[in-house]
Amino acid sequence: MKILAKWLALAVLLCTMPAKAALDIVITEGVDAARPIAVMPFQWQGAGAPPQAIADVVMSDLIRSGTFKPLDELGLPQRGIGALAQFDASAWANVGAEAVVVGSVKPYGTDQFLVSFDLIDLVKAQNQALKGPTSATEFLMDSRQTVISAAQFRQYGHRISDIVYEKLTGIRGAFLTRISYVVVNHTQKAAYSLMIADYDGYNEQMLLRSPEPLMSPSWSPDGRRLAYVSFENKKAEIFVQDLYTQVRTKVSSFPGINGAPTFSPDGKSLAVTLSKDGQPEIYVIDIATKAAKRITNHYSIDTEPSWYPDGKSLLFTSERGGRPQLYRVDLNSGKVTRETFEGEWNLGGSITPDGRSMIFVNRTNGKFNIARMDLSTRFMQVLTSTRLDESPSVAPNGTMVIYGTTYQGKQVLAAVSTDGRFKARLPVGQGEVKSPSWSPFL
């Protein structure tokens, strides 16, 4: 029970941070090694100023991806171009970037704007320029236009980023996703707030506020619901809340521990930790009927379940080997297999959406860091270098991990790419932030 007490204390501690309009993202490592790309300011074809600079959103997204490094606009060979027709391939011959994004915005009626953009392959354009005159469309990677309102500028900027990212990497972009997290501010009577925001911290919304701890938010596969643990009734209970209707459903309120909910891939069940029959064990609860099926049965602590992408197995943390390690249980046979062996502890694990890697918290020499293990080679890579990392959650495209850590004595969120190159911190002005969860594709 000593280990469980530590985990529960950590989880309660994890629930304490302040609400703010947006989380600030401070990039701490990895930009210099990223792939150069050019993003031109979108040409404004109206009076006054545009509602928002879409190119700024795109540049910020590409930087935060850890994959791309937008070049300084002042060093680009052309200015004020908004379409492929204005692009001069010969002028870009010595620009060390693989692509350029150009676009335009013009009024299109009352609170309506026509946004157009072109993604141009600079490598192909430079090669064609050496061969002589050719059709510019040969190096056009994508071209789109859409009518949006002023309120949609930021979201459409994320959409452009998704398109650019996928065209250049072959991986779906995750810039139109959201995150949930718990903010704790003990200067307020209701100190705990369950928040959701865009992946970059903008458009923050409060889902629930409570004087008692809130923890462990988890997204449904369709992005419509959140499961979480609340102590509002002076005991741990698991709720599922619809983000659109705000309807809350109490799913689990058994005696003892009700914790660590995570949705099944089909959204019909929750894997949870319950202690109603004695020791903390893994159960699967049918959300519609509330029926709980016991999955593990061991005298040691079993907790922190997460699903394999095929829905046929669960990954969980157990100290059945003497120390917390990650195990896999087959839901049909009940067979349990140990998955981790390196380091002192390994806990809080999840499988990446492609099923190829495991992301988890590794403790080695007393330091808690986020780590990744390749499931085919079993090679483990420690991704972070701080000391008190916890609660990793993987982006739906598998390229980034958001997690909780400590910075200057406060709980903050941080992000790291799954190759460990790119690192960023997401601090807030007051209070602390913890228990992050990254949404599916929306």
Swiss-Prot record:
Keyword line: Cell cycle, Cell division, Periplasm, Signal
Location (main, coarse): periplasm
Compartment(s) where it occurs, according to its Swiss-Prot or TrEMBL record: Periplasm
GO BP annotations listed: cell division; protein import
Gene3D superfamilies referenced in this protein's UniProt entry, alphabetically: TolB, C-terminal domain (2.120.10.30), TolB, N-terminal domain (3.40.50.10070)
Similarity remark: Belongs to the TolB family.
Subunit structure: The Tol-Pal system is composed of five core proteins: the inner membrane proteins TolA, TolQ and TolR, the periplasmic protein TolB and the outer membrane protein Pal. They form a network linking the inner and outer membranes and the peptidoglycan layer.
Protein function: Part of the Tol-Pal system, which plays a role in outer membrane invagination during cell division and is important for maintaining outer membrane integrity.
Protein name as it appears in the record: Tol-Pal system protein TolB
Species for this entry: Shewanella sp. (strain ANA-3)
Gene (UniProt): tolB
